[in-house]
Amino acid sequence: MQEHWANLNGLKIRYLESGKGNDKHILFIHGLGSSADRWVGIPKSLSANFHTISLDLPGFGESDKPASMNYTIENFSDIVIDFMNLLAINDGKTSIVGHSLGGYIAAEVTILHKIQVERLVLIDSSGMLEKPTALLEEYLSVAMNPTTDKVRNIFEQMVTDSTKIPLKLVESFIKRINLPNAKYAFKSTLENSTNTQLERERLKLIDGIPTLIIWGNEDKVIPVEHSDLFKESISNSHVEIIQDAGHAPFTEKPEQVFELIRNFLT
C-alpha cells in the first residue's frame, strides 16, 4: 500500500492506496480511535482486482485534527464525499467498507450519494445505539488518560483472542491519542455518534444497493443483535455472523472476512 496525502480545503487527509488502474474501487473507513492501518492486509489482498483506498478520518491516525471541527457524522460524511470527488472515485464504481463508526459514516454517505456507491459492507456498525454501551464509556475514559496497561485491557475486551492485540497496536494508539487535539476529536466523535441514530426509515433509502452486514458474535461494544436492526431496515442485505470474534472480526478472522468481502464484491 502506498501512502498519500489529500488536501481538502486545507484539511490534510492521509490515505493508503493500492491497485490503482483497476476499474472498480473499494473505500475502507475505519472505526473510532483507529486508522487506515488497521485493516490487516485486506485492502492489499483485494488490490489484485480492485483499486483499494483506506483513509485516516480527520481527527484520527495521521490526518489533521482541527480543534475547530465538530466531529459529527454529517461532517465526516461530507468530508468522505469530498475525498471521493477529489480522487475521482465518484463514478458509481465504488464499494464502501465501513467498520463501527466507519459503518455509520458509510451508510450515511450511501444515503446521501447513492449514485456514487455500487455496494456497501457494514462491519459491526454503529448507528443504532441509543446511548454509549458500558465498554464504549470505558474506552472514552481510557482514551482520555491512556497507559499501556489500560489500553491493552480495553482492547482485549473487544476481541476473543488477546493475542490479536500486539504491543505495537497499543503503542500506536497511545502515540496518536496524545497528538494535539486527538483527545478532543475522540470525545467529540463518540458523543456525536452515540447521541444520534440512523433512523429505520432513513436506512430504507439504501434500498437497491446490495449490502453485506458482517458481525462478530462476541461483540461487546455493539451487540450482535444490532445486525438484525440493519438487516430489517435495508431490503437488499444479508448478514454473516463471524463465530469466535469480537468487535473487529477482520482482525481475528481476516481470511474469513476477506473471502466474504471478495465474494460479495466480485
List the predicted regions and their residue ranges.
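Acidic catalytic loop of the alpha/beta-hydrolase fold
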Residues: 218-222
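Flexible "cap/lid" loop of the alpha/beta hydrolase fold
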Residues: 107-111, 118-148
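Catalytic active-site module of serine/aspartate enzymes centered on a nucleophile-bearing elbow/loop
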Residues: 237-266
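Conserved HGGG/HGGXW glycine-rich cap/lid loop of the alpha/beta-hydrolase fold
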Residues: 11, 16-62
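Active-site loop/oxyanion-hole signature of alpha/beta-hydrolase fold enzymes
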Residues: 16, 54-97, 101, 259
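Conserved alpha/beta-hydrolase catalytic His-Asp/Glu region
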Residues: 13, 130-133, 146-208
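Short beta-strand/loop motif that positions the catalytic acidic residue
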Residues: 213-215
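Alpha/beta-hydrolase fold catalytic core
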Residues: 1-26, 48-50, 85, 89, ...
